[in-house]
A protein has these predicted regions:
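Acidic/histidine-rich catalytic cores of soluble enzymes
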Residues: 28-29, 60, 119-215
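Flexible loop residues that form catalytic
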Residues: 34, 65, 101, 165, ...
Length: 216
């Protein structure tokens, strides 16, 4: 089992984060896009810096507001995705996290969402990349892992799978037992986080009060 940590979990420059992650003996990183945007080098330079420290770039995140969109916005998002794929190939990163849509323009149509994610996965497959779909606890139409899995099942593409995040499941008091019914090969990535029990908006809770596992 590979162990990765999200760069957003640590403070400092991206270089400092990589050094700390390597010192903690992780195998790789989840690259948070704002960390890459603030990086002064190229994607290939970042890939080499990570490799020199013994780290892989396991996941690129997040890709927002994609599925369930009207046709024109969907086409624009496909173009946006292709540019992310360009970056991922330079980084040597095989997996992109697509989080469930929060846009007011999105449509609550699971069939549409599945078809659009299928098209995204098909484009990713042409580059030997994969797509992981994650239910955000504050998603407009999809906020539970079972809803996300339903869409992944409908999309039915080998390069599309599920990403699970313990915070998004447990913050909504959702029952995680159903995860055992999902085929393991369809779960592409698992993120573990802890948090204190707080009565507050789930977005602010997620962004400002998440802890490392076991530190809740």
């Amino acid at each position: 089992m590979r162990r990765s940590i999200a760069t957003v979990s640590l403070s400092g420059t991206l270089r400092q984060k990589l050094e700390a992650i390597a010192a903690a003996r992780f195998d790789g990183i989840e690259l948070f896009e704002p960390d890459f945007i603030s990086f002064t080098g190229s994607a290939r330079e970042l890939r080499q810096q990570a490799a020199d420290l013994g780290l892989g770039i396991d996941l690129y995140q997040p890709f927002r507001d994609f599925e369930g969109m009207p046709d024109e916005l969907f086409r624009r998002s496909l173009d946006r995705a292709e540019r992310k794929f360009d970056v991922m190939q330079e980084l040597g990163c095989p997996l992109m996290l697509v989080c469930s849509n929060t846009s007011p323009a999105s449509l609550g149509d699971a069939e549409r969402a599945a078809a659009q994610l299928h098209e995204l996965a098909e484009r990713a497959s042409r580059r030997n990349l994969r797509i992981g779909y994650e239910a955000l606890a504050w998603g407009k139409w999809v906020n539970l892992y079972k809803q996300a899995w339903n869409i992944v099942e409908k999309a039915d593409h080998p390069h599309l799978g599920l990403i699970l995040d313990s915070f998004h499941t447990l913050s909504l008091r959702d029952d995680p037992m159903g995860i055992a019914d999902i085929p393991g090969e369809r779960i592409f990535f698992v993120q573990m986080a802890d948090a204190p029990l707080l009565a507050m908006d789930v977005i602010q809770w997620a962004r400002h009060h998440r802890n490392f596992p076991g530190q809740g």
